[in-house]
Structures are given as C-alpha cells and as structure tokens.
C-alpha cells in the first residue's frame, strides 16, 4: 500500500481479528507491551468491570469502518469473585453480562485459548449489546484479581433503536464547543485620558514697563 503509513492502516480498514488471531497475536502482545502497528490505537486499556455498555459507548468511539455495528475493543481485567477463581463478576450498573456460551479455540489441533460470548441484559431482557471475551493460555495473563482478557463489545445483529442511539452517544462528546480564551495578541485598550485639573495654576498678565525720563 504505497503512500499509506503503517499506523494509518487501521483508520482505513476494519479491525476484525479472527479467534485464533485474538488469542495468539493480539492478546500476547497486549500482555507484553509489544507494538501492534497501529491497531493498539483502537484498543482501549481500561477497566470495564462494572461499566454499562452505554457508558463505554459514550466515552469511546467505535473503531473505523465499524460505526454501524459499534465495534469497540478493550484490553481489561476480568475480575474474579471473592474467594473464587472460576466465577467472574458480571454485574454492571443496572444490568448483568450473561454468558451465552464458552468455546475452545484450537490451532493446528492444539487448544490455544477460549472465547466467551456474552449478552448484556436488564431485568432478564437483552439490551442489544453483546461481547466476545478472549482468553489465552499464557501464565502472565493471570493476575492477582482476575485474568487479563481482550474484548470486543458491539451491537447485536438486530439491536433495538435504543441500543443504536447509545452507540452514537460519543458524538455528543465530540460536538462540545471548545472553551474560548482571549487572544494573547489582542490589542490593548488605550489608557483613559487624564482628567483636567480642577484648580489650574493662575497665569498673571504681563506687567507694564515704566520708563523714567530725567531732564538736566
């Protein structure tokens, strides 16, 4: 792609990793801090545990070429419940992330990770937000309070209008006017004219010259 910088590639092409790529390429590099050649600009390193999708959607814009589906990518910690390393905390605001299924990811006949498909629900009903949560088998992915995961949050195929409006909430943040500051080069106002002296000094009229003539 002549004339196109590597870091600009993901601004023109949709970030859509396969399951194998998610756990064998992206997640290991996110854990080690290696560069992702531009894709890291689209992956937000933020703790999303306890956050509702609408709040995340208002804060982070969807990835380029994925505005209609609302794709947002996160590198985060899936926190474990207190006293358990198996069950994960799924409550988020007034709703809950419900695990729909867990699938093993294999490459060349060997398990390399797994993906959990989740749906965000309120009062038992789907809101139209879904997420794929990818986990690898690297030991460094396990931390003291949970497991480091790579997530893709997006709209379901038949998401209701309410969810689609939530996905576009980031536009309101972008449209906020910038604070207006006075120009440092603004012309200074001239100082006010000095007030007239109410008691000006008296000017005496010129004195007449007296010439004496002496007669002899």
Model regions and ranges:
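Beta-strand cores of modular interaction/reader domains in eukaryotic scaffold and signaling proteins
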Residues: 73-76, 119-121, 130-135, 149-154
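Structural scaffold elements adjacent to functional motifs in cytosolic proteins
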Residues: 1-126, 143-144
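Terminal low-complexity, poorly structured segments
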Residues: 23, 131, 198-202
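Short amphipathic alpha-helices and their capping/turn residues within compact interaction modules
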Residues: 27, 31-32, 136-139, 155
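Intrinsically disordered, low-complexity acidic/polar and Pro/Ser/Thr-rich regulatory regions
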Residues: 2-11, 139-216
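A short secondary-structure junction signal
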Residues: 85-88, 128-133, 142, 160-166
């Amino acid at each position: 792609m002549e004339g196109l910088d590597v870091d600009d590639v993901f601004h023109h092409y949709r970030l859509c990793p396969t399951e194998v790529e998610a756990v064998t390429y992206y997640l290991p590099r996110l854990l080690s801090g290696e560069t992702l050649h531009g894709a890291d600009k689209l992956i937000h390193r933020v703790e999303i545990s306890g956050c509702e999708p609408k709040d995340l959607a208002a804060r982070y814009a969807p990835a380029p070429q994925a505005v209609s589906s609302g794709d947002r990518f996160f590198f985060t910690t899936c926190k474990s419940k207190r006293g358990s390393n198996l069950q994960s905390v799924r409550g988020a605001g007034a709703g809950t992330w419900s695990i729909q299924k867990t699938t093993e990811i294999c490459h060349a006949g060997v398990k390399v990770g797994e993906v959990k498909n989740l749906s965000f629900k309120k009062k038992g009903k789907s809101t139209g937000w879904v997420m794929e949560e990818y986990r690898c088998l690297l030991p460094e992915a396990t931390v003291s309070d949970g497991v480091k995961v790579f997530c893709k949050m997006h709209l379901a195929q038949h998401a209701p209008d309410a969810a689609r409006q939530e996905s576009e909430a980031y536009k309101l943040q972008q449209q906020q006017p910038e604070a207006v500051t006075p120009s440092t080069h603004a012309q200074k106002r001239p100082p006010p004219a000095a007030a007239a002296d109410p008691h000006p000094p008296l000017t005496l009229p010129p004195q007449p010259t007296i010439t004496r003539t002496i007669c002899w």
